């Protein structure tokens, strides 16, 4: 049966799955000569496991049956693409990543360009303090040589040969120099800290500025928790790199240069010997620096994920508690913590290997210099003082090199965090809020011409296709339709959060795709179903976004118009009452009325009401509808309402009905459409009306009621049986049911209910809206 070919084995997958592209990337699998003693013998291969990164799980070859005693020839699955191409791409990616690292570092330091005077002053003070500090080994060497040549002399009679000064005067001058070095060190620390704080503040301001001017597509793809993490933890890492480590790095660089110069002047032979240890140090810094940078970026991303989870849990804490899901959310948070722990552990091992390598090289160099320096002293080629000074310079220079390695490590971490911040600043929004012509408001004529639209995050799901309608100036129009058919999307398109895929949207005969977004939005007021208030006072929220400062009378007038003046005046601080984050100290209806006042005080040309009265009680809704009715009569603005409730639809003059495909199926006066029982509006409102119980629901209730009566009767019989010990056996046989009988009855009840539900589903008809001529 084999006939020179290996048949399809039992791989635990279907034959048609092998044709999928992701399975086509399996590595080449060869089966060597498998000899079977008989044609029907079953060869178990249950232990043979093939693992492919393309699939992500093992494919178990369970068994196959051979019908021939012939040797099975070599057979292989299609091999993957050539390795050379992948290697080339990998090498190119590594080179590109390395280039990006250096670009991020350069960009980070370019932020300090405008403070170059401050930077130069700090470097000058740092040079002074480092130079004085690096003179200590030389001074120690001079003092030791002086003491050796003047053994037995009085201390005050000792003179330094180089300067011809008494030793005590020399030490006094050196003490003054050390004090100057300390003052310079204090000054450089303050200046560099101020400089770094300015750089980080500038970076944060730039990031938040770019973020606030991004388009809606950006916020669809980025969660709030991740953005908060970038502004918080990532900026902190950059701040630490720019404050502590930059200062230490510059100090280490100066100390290293001065130390190498002093060592070369003391003993060129020992200096040449130390050069052999330089390449290994540079090599380790190059190898481990890249790893540290990558782990730092991974750590920041894991921290961002943790922040996202915490932000989602805390913002929805009432939902979590109402569903008693604290345990599930705790598990989610623990998973994010474990991810951070794993990345942190990897970073710890990488840093440990790097610092251990540099420390080992430093210790080896120190011992080598000590051994060879001792030989030079014995050969009278080097004095004891110079050897001591050289050894101290070796230690100082080693610490400087170690400081540079730490500086490089921290800079790589800062580059990893900075790259995430630069991703935000470098992104150009598809809809710039500051580009375009200034909107010239007229009367608020709105027209959609052959508009088709899909959200950028879901391009395959079309919301509109060739949508056409026109809204007259000063009119009141309500947009209704089935849920999820794009009613709120129309509001987003009018505010130009998105551009239509095809077609044009005009306001006052001006194509909004060519208008400045800020200029357009200043003339459009919007009240959403779930209003968002800012932390601050009630006055701040009513006047939010205004380009001028309104008078107290204007604020009070619009508050009365929206029927929120009464409850505001009941607060101790009235309009200056702080309402907390997102208005948490107010009720839902109070927040909604303040949001309406916020929209009306700007006197917009177009007012968009997206379920604006959904959070109000009947009395408040009636009052607000009265206000909107007065606005409609004044014809001062075009009002576009999005609603499901009849009370909201009724107040509008005209109605636009959207169908299931997102197209307009009906337009007209509300009274005319509502009076016509065959109109799309009537059909939609009748479907949304709360119907009485169906026949199936009544039957289900009867079945459940019957079961409850049976259970009650069983309970009474059981109680009677327990009280009557003499007739116990007889009652058990006649009244009590066996467990099997009870289970059968429960199954019958469940099947009856399930059958009735199926019948109800069959009889249920979806909403069908037919276009009216």
UniProtKB/Swiss-Prot annotation:
<dbReference type="InterPro" id="IPR003439">
    <property type="entry name" value="ABC_transporter-like_ATP-bd"/>
</dbReference>
<dbReference type="Pfam" id="PF00005">
    <property type="entry name" value="ABC_tran"/>
</dbReference>
<dbReference type="GO" id="GO:0015421">
    <property type="term" value="F:ABC-type oligopeptide transporter activity"/>
</dbReference>
<dbReference type="GO" id="GO:0005739">
    <property type="term" value="C:mitochondrion"/>
</dbReference>
<feature type="domain" description="ABC transmembrane type-1">
    <location>
        <begin position="119"/>
        <end position="413"/>
    </location>
</feature>
<keyword id="KW-0812">Transmembrane</keyword>
<feature type="compositionally biased region" description="Polar residues">
    <location>
        <begin position="73"/>
        <end position="84"/>
    </location>
</feature>
<dbReference type="InterPro" id="IPR003593">
    <property type="entry name" value="AAA+_ATPase"/>
</dbReference>
<keyword id="KW-0813">Transport</keyword>
<dbReference type="GO" id="GO:0090374">
    <property type="term" value="P:oligopeptide export from mitochondrion"/>
</dbReference>
<dbReference type="GO" id="GO:0005524">
    <property type="term" value="F:ATP binding"/>
</dbReference>
<feature type="transmembrane region" description="Helical">
    <location>
        <begin position="123"/>
        <end position="143"/>
    </location>
</feature>
<keyword id="KW-0067">ATP-binding</keyword>
<feature type="region of interest" description="Disordered">
    <location>
        <begin position="73"/>
        <end position="95"/>
    </location>
</feature>
<dbReference type="InterPro" id="IPR036640">
    <property type="entry name" value="ABC1_TM_sf"/>
</dbReference>
<dbReference type="GO" id="GO:1904680">
    <property type="term" value="F:peptide transmembrane transporter activity"/>
</dbReference>
<dbReference type="InterPro" id="IPR017871">
    <property type="entry name" value="ABC_transporter-like_CS"/>
</dbReference>
<comment type="similarity">
    <text>Belongs to the ABC transporter superfamily. ABCB family. Mitochondrial peptide exporter (TC 3.A.1.212) subfamily.</text>
</comment>
<feature type="binding site">
    <location>
        <begin position="481"/>
        <end position="488"/>
    </location>
    <ligand>
        <name>ATP</name>
    </ligand>
</feature>
<feature type="transit peptide" description="Mitochondrion">
    <location>
        <begin position="1"/>
        <end position="90"/>
    </location>
</feature>
<feature type="region of interest" description="Disordered">
    <location>
        <begin position="706"/>
        <end position="773"/>
    </location>
</feature>
<keyword id="KW-0472">Membrane</keyword>
<keyword id="KW-0547">Nucleotide-binding</keyword>
<dbReference type="InterPro" id="IPR013305">
    <property type="entry name" value="ABC_Tap-like"/>
</dbReference>
<dbReference type="InterPro" id="IPR011527">
    <property type="entry name" value="ABC1_TM_dom"/>
</dbReference>
<keyword id="KW-0496">Mitochondrion</keyword>
<keyword id="KW-1133">Transmembrane helix</keyword>
<feature type="compositionally biased region" description="Basic and acidic residues">
    <location>
        <begin position="740"/>
        <end position="762"/>
    </location>
</feature>
<feature type="compositionally biased region" description="Basic and acidic residues">
    <location>
        <begin position="706"/>
        <end position="733"/>
    </location>
</feature>
<dbReference type="GO" id="GO:0016887">
    <property type="term" value="F:ATP hydrolysis activity"/>
</dbReference>
<protein>
    <recommendedName>
        <fullName>ATP-dependent permease MDL2, mitochondrial</fullName>
    </recommendedName>
</protein>
<keyword id="KW-0999">Mitochondrion inner membrane</keyword>
<feature type="transmembrane region" description="Helical">
    <location>
        <begin position="170"/>
        <end position="192"/>
    </location>
</feature>
<feature type="domain" description="ABC transporter">
    <location>
        <begin position="493"/>
        <end position="733"/>
    </location>
</feature>
<dbReference type="GO" id="GO:0005743">
    <property type="term" value="C:mitochondrial inner membrane"/>
</dbReference>
<feature type="transmembrane region" description="Helical">
    <location>
        <begin position="257"/>
        <end position="277"/>
    </location>
</feature>
<keyword id="KW-0809">Transit peptide</keyword>
<dbReference type="InterPro" id="IPR027417">
    <property type="entry name" value="P-loop_NTPase"/>
</dbReference>
<dbReference type="InterPro" id="IPR039421">
    <property type="entry name" value="Type_1_exporter"/>
</dbReference>
<dbReference type="Pfam" id="PF00664">
    <property type="entry name" value="ABC_membrane"/>
</dbReference>
